[in-house]
Amino acid sequence: MGSVRTNRYSIVSSEEDGMKLATLAVANGFGNGKSKVHTRQQCRSRFVKKDGHCNVQFINVGEKGQRYLADIFTTCVDIRWRWMLVIFCLAFVLSWLFFGCVFWLIALLHGDLDASKESKACVSEVNSFTAAFLFSIETQTTIGYGFRCVTDECPVAVFMVVFQSIVGCIIDAFIIGAVMAKMAKPKKRNETLVFSHNAVIAMRDGKLCLMWRVGNLRKSHLVEAHVRAQLLKSRITSEGEYIPLDQIDINVGFDSGIDRIFLVSPITIVHEIDEDSPLYDLSKQDIDNADFEIVVILEGMVEATAMTTQCRSSYLANEILWGHRYEPVLFEEKHYYKVDYSRFHKTYEVPNTPLCSARDLAEKKYILSNANSFCYENEVALTSKEEDDSENGVPESTSTDTPPDIDLHNQASVPLEPRPLRRESEI
């Protein structure tokens, strides 16, 4: 049964190591139900890669070519540049050849190819196919060298000149429009929108929260920026229906409006793990053994073009660090704020993070330590980071009276010296 299901529902290509189907809970599909269906180990790739590309292949699509040709403009905009240039070059060459053949046939039927004929030609100086082809190029591109020209002898030739001029304008307009649309696509804008390599779970305001960080490497703003997230998980319903990828929304503040962000400096997106969260029943051990993928999406309008762009990434269960927080990247200077992107992906461990699920924490099954200890650990983490930077060659601005063998993590009474970089600003 497992092999049949694999062949039937394998819609994702296996290009990299992915998640493994180990245990499916009938109740909610997240490995915490009482009734579990055990299946054989199965490797599965990401649904959305780290660079944002969807790892999906479409097969057995009926009338695919006709559907793509029916929307030829979108097809030309979406294809690669090399194929786009090939299509446009072929469009020009084929149009020149077609009208060259038409003018050659007109000259042939009128007898202009006969050198002994002294009557007026339909197109002067067109006495071979090569000459007709050159006349076609000169007409469509409006070069006009002056040797070949249409006369009033043949109305058909005059009509074909007018018709070719109109066709040439249509081809030029289509090409210019497609090239401009392709150049204006905000796809490359995503190269300067970054997500942190790992997501983290830690305490914030007395509650367990799932967090990840987003940043904008350009100084130009992303207008109306907002974030979304979904959890993808295979599950079996209570009726026995197998859903390969069940998509569950993760609340990042849509109802309250905090999903809309002012992305000038890196921002940490926070999902509060409450009773409505799909992670509510998962502890650290459950996360370590879980099989799911969290897809995160950042949308907004490019300030320069006012076109909407979407940046995507994903986190597997093994890319979620429990009991970690991100290192500060925003520091306040005298007249400005400084962003240090070398710390963007770095995290530090918070030892007193509860290992239980958010449900157990809400039901008081886990006793939290004093909140002040977290503040001290936060400052010590920053102190340790600055000491590491000093050892790597960064000039030290702190006191050097402390012996090198003192463990700052165990010396709660050691006062912290003032730092040149202030705390991370709250956004």
Swiss-Prot record:
Residues 1-81, 179-427 are cytoplasmic. The gene is KCNJ2. GO terms for biological process: cardiac muscle cell action potential involved in contraction; magnesium ion transport; potassium ion import across plasma membrane; potassium ion transport; protein homotetramerization; regulation of heart rate by cardiac conduction; regulation of membrane repolarization; regulation of monoatomic ion transmembrane transport. Residues 129-140, 141-147 dip into the membrane without crossing it. The record marks D172 as: Role in the control of polyamine-mediated channel gating and in the blocking by intracellular magnesium. It comes from Bos taurus. The chain crosses the membrane at residues 82-106, 157-178. GO terms for cellular component: membrane; plasma membrane; T-tubule; voltage-gated potassium channel complex. Coiled coil: none annotated. This is Inward rectifier potassium channel 2. Signal peptide: none annotated. It holds the Pfam family IRK. PANTHER family: INWARD RECTIFIER POTASSIUM CHANNEL, INWARD RECTIFIER POTASSIUM CHANNEL 2. Belongs to the inward rectifier-type potassium channel (TC 1.A.2.1) family. KCNJ2 subfamily. Homotetramer. Homomultimeric and heteromultimeric association with KCNJ4/Kir2.3. Can form heteromeric channels with Kir2.6/KCNJ18. Associates, via its PDZ-recognition domain, with a complex containing LIN7A, LIN7B, LIN7C, DLG1, CASK and APBA1. The modification S-nitrosocysteine is found at C76. Keywords: Cell membrane, Ion channel, Ion transport, Membrane, Potassium, Potassium transport, S-nitrosylation, Transmembrane, Transmembrane helix, Transport, Voltage-gated channel. A motif (PDZ-binding) lies at residues 425-427. Gene3D superfamilies: 1.10.287.70, G protein-activated inward rectifier potassium channel 1. Activated by phosphatidylinositol 4,5 biphosphate (PtdIns(4,5)P2). It is found in: Cell membrane; Cell membrane, Sarcolemma, T-tubule.
